[in-house]
């Protein structure tokens, strides 16, 4: 049985659902039991068996109330047009801990670039936490599907299938032969890598800036079309605002997070000074309508907090405090530093911790 449960499942918050996802090495059928109801990895009524990562979507309310779920795997002997041969179902039950109402602890990992042990150590330095934020470039590129396993290994080691995670795509994730299938290997909402989510009294929105240079940059070799992708997100953001009573103004929301791998309030030098009009519109809509408490970013490989009155930083415009919380070193010994968050009424505390067991800096924003 252990070969089928090599990794604990990852439980990702997407919209008003949890996507329970788990990598597998052999063909099998995958379903999850929550309470007395089964949820299946199926496509239009057909159980999937050939995918490398299974996905089952469960309503948040159901799993939060049940506080446990059972992963069910039925190994395939031979899948045939008639009388498919299978083995008996293997089951493993996991406890599940919904995000609490107060003193909510989260840890942010970005730009790990294929490191696993080091970001895990940095997170463990912060201590126990209630949910994990994976904010882009967890892998170094999407040229090899085996790299996606690193995402699930980090979730497995830190969350153990018992607590939720939030996932955002980074610019390096757009590179390589399997980048076009990235959403098949990671959480998404209707195929999109941008969406809102809810965890307890926390509401959040993920925006995906795509690549960090113009679409026609030679590095991409005509393989990206991020401008139209960003235009779609402008319309998505407007729809979120139109539906605000079911989104960031819904009953019970106390904290509003903006998560994006790229720091789009800060204009970098050419060729990284892209999409100034689109980003200006995002900033205006977010600042005037959504009003998030904090913008959680990576990309720059640094550990910093920038406030709205910092005109040097907010060259595209300001929304709220920006926390950049991911630093990595892969030469002369692997090293990683990330960022812990503690959310309380009227206060957010950030703690930068590293893989050497050090707390580098703490700050209340």
Predicted features along the sequence, with ranges:
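Extended active-site neighborhood of metal-dependent phosphoesterases/phosphodiesterases
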Residues: 74-85, 91-92, 149-247, 281-282, ...
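An acidic-aromatic substrate-binding cleft motif
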Residues: 84-135, 140-141
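A general structural motif
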Residues: 103, 129, 162, 248-255, ...
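Acidic/histidine-rich helix-loop elements
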Residues: 105-119, 140-146, 213-229
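Active-site neighborhood of phospho(di)ester-bond hydrolases with catalytic His/Asp-centered motifs
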Residues: 107-111, 131-137, 163-171, 257-261, ...
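Acidic-and-aromatic substrate-binding clefts and catalytic sites of carbohydrate-active enzymes
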Residues: 112-117, 140-146, 174-175, 268-269, ...
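Active-site-proximal segments of metal-dependent phosphoesterases and phosphodiesterases across multiple
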Residues: 226, 245-294
